[in-house]
């Protein structure tokens, strides 16, 4: 009978075996960490982008002393002027004081809403520039927005009292729509309809309040009647659709915002997101809204950017824009919606 002899491993072999064991263990740990990180939302303070944008000294980023002046510089003064000219071509000459007041009101309401929106959304950029609250801080930015809106309300009441009721009513509707959107974000989907048609209708009603009221306000201020409500509502709905779609479909928009699918990561509903909930694999969208981990967001984006959802969004944009092309030419926003399934 042959006896098997075993010899102890040499020192080099033992070292190699130990190194191999450590390497395998380290790789396993990396895989576990990656899977864990990929499945859970990362704290915003871990983002290098989040750390770099904020400035302790606003003067190092802009010479403008307040958030409102800063965002107004980005968009330009009186950016609603083309719409006013279309609604009333001679207002600038017939009543220059009212003409200027209408433009001041529209700038103040629109831009101040964006200041607060960017805080709510945690946005880092606005049109490729640092968002105002990332320069001046959330508290000063929000307070300046409230201050400017209060100033414009007082100026309207004292100087143009016949315009004040229109402004107050439409501003209330805008904020009601914004509040509804924020409640959905806070509560998740438990208070949102489940049937596809009901979901789309609920979202469109919110958009009509939040965005539609802003556009209708312009018609109310210029014409002092409701004769353009239907047209302004349609222009507003297209604007909302365009904004929603570019958030998930536009490479250009993602570069300017410094984020892809910001609405989804923030747990905020948009038209493509609402449609995707009822698409095949729509449960990924629900999961991403509840827990926006990289894994959930990637899978949700795959559904949102699917051919079916993309085609439904493009069809709605085409239908809503068919009768308002002259108004959309004034709006002038044409981001290329080129992102597809991932």
Curated annotation (Swiss-Prot):
What topology in the membrane does the UniProt record assign?
A: Single-pass membrane protein
Q: Carbohydrate attachment sites?
A: 154
- Indicate the transmembrane segments per the record: 17-37
Instruction: List the Gene3D superfamilies.
Output: Farnesyl Diphosphate Synthase
Report what the protein is called: Prenyl transferase ptmC
The residues the record assigns to binding Mg(2+) 2 are 117, 121
What is the role of this chain? Prenyl transferase; part of the gene cluster that mediates the biosynthesis of the indole diterpenes penitrems. The geranylgeranyl diphosphate (GGPP) synthase ptmG catalyzes the first step in penitrem biosynthesis via conversion of farnesyl pyrophosphate and isopentyl pyrophosphate into geranylgeranyl pyrophosphate (GGPP). Condensation of indole-3-glycerol phosphate with GGPP by the prenyl transferase ptmC then forms 3-geranylgeranylindole (3-GGI).
The gene coding this protein: ptmC
Site feature: Important for determining product chain length: 146
E.C. designation(s): 2.5.1.-
Q: Where in the cell is it found?
A: Membrane
Which GO BP terms, alphabetically? alcohol biosynthetic process; isoprenoid biosynthetic process; mycotoxin biosynthetic process
- Residues annotated for Mg(2+) 1 binding in this entry: 117, 121
Q: Where does isopentenyl diphosphate bind?
A: 110
Q: Which family does it belong to?
A: Belongs to the FPP/GGPP synthase family.
